[in-house]
Every structure is written in structure tokens, then in C-alpha cells.
Amino acid sequence: MSTIAKDQTQVNEKIRAKELRLIGQDGEQIGVKTKNEALEMAERVGLDVVIMAPNAKPPVARIMDYGKYKFEQQKKEKEMKKKQKTINLKEIRLSPTIEEHDFQTKLKNGRKFLEKGDKCKVSIRFRGRAITHKEIGQRVLEKFAEQCKDIATVEQRPKMDGRQMFIMLSPINEK
């Protein structure tokens, strides 16, 4: 059977099925009717015949106001989009030998990202021989996580990836 696009619901004359399982406007089962009988019944009450389940045998149709139905669907879709929250991943780059004031500035930015609800990846890039002192970088990352523990949880512990060590922080959801 052919698939129907989301906004191409079969209504009234566009219905291709010869027989329909009809549901009345109040939700009561009317039974299996021909397409013409269903259209006549809907016309008598000034409503439309809308296919609800096109893949059923016979297809399930309902007598309703199609304009109102379409409006309700759009309203529900809009509401669902509002409820969805996109979570962005922000990255903060530090060095293993970062000074305290620079650290505080980066920390302030990281806290701002977390308070907005974004995830935060804090990374340290080791240059030259600094790679031999990974524990210094790990201490910096753990200090960062420690100072954000009131608003964030550690999603991923400090981990090496090539010449870079990183930690993932995600915001604590208030409910």
C-alpha cells in the first residue's frame, strides 16, 4: 500500500477505499459503510470524513470537522516542539599550567554554560614535554569539576585522548 505524507490525510472525495469502518462524531462505532454512504452521512451533519487508520482492513474513518482536526494537530505539534529542549555541547580549553585568575575566568564561563542547561566539555591540551605530567592536568580538571559540583554532575571522568585530556560535565536538572 502506498504511504501518505504527514499532511496528506485522505479526506472526503480524496478517499480511495471503497469500504470504510466508520466512527461517528461522538466516537460511537457506526460500522462498515461504503465510501458514498459515509460521505452522505457526513454531509447531512455538515462535517467531513477523515481517514484515521489507512492501513487497517477496511480503513478506519471518522466523521469530524477536518479544519478543526488539522488545527488541533498543529497545536499539539507546536506544543511538543516547545517541550523539546536542545542541549548544546560547549567546550572550555585550559592548559596544565593555567594561572588562578585565568582559571576563575574559565570557571565563570563554564558555570554560565551549565546554568543555561548546556553540557560542558573541559579539555586540557598538553604541548611538548608537558605530556609527561598528566597528573597536573588531571588535578586542574578535577578542581574545575569540584567547583561546579553544586550545578553539575561529572558525566565522564578525566580521560586522555591523544595529547588532550578532557572531562564532561552535565547540568543538574531541577524538577
UniProtKB/Swiss-Prot annotation:
The UniProt record lists the keyword Protein biosynthesis: yes
UniProt source species: Staphylococcus saprophyticus subsp. saprophyticus (strain ATCC 15305 / DSM 20229 / NCIMB 8711 / NCTC 7292 / S-41)
Subunit architecture: Monomer.
PROSITE patterns with a match to the protein in the record: IF3
Family, per entry: Belongs to the IF-3 family.
Residue ranges of the TM segments: none
InterPro entries found in the cross-reference section: T_IF-3_C_sf, T_IF-3_N_sf, Translation_initiation_fac3_CS, Translation_initiation_fac_3, Translation_initiation_fac_3_C, Translation_initiation_fac_3_N
SUPFAM superfamilies: Translation initiation factor IF3, C-terminal domain (SSF55200), Translation initiation factor IF3, N-terminal domain (SSF54364)
Reported function: IF-3 binds to the 30S ribosomal subunit and shifts the equilibrium between 70S ribosomes and their 50S and 30S subunits in favor of the free subunits, thus enhancing the availability of 30S subunits on which protein synthesis initiation begins.
Subcellular location: Cytoplasm
Name listed for the protein in its UniProt record: Translation initiation factor IF-3
Biological process terms in GO annotation: ribosome disassembly
Coiled coil residues, start to end: none
One Pfam family from the record: IF3_C
GO CC, one annotated term: cytosol
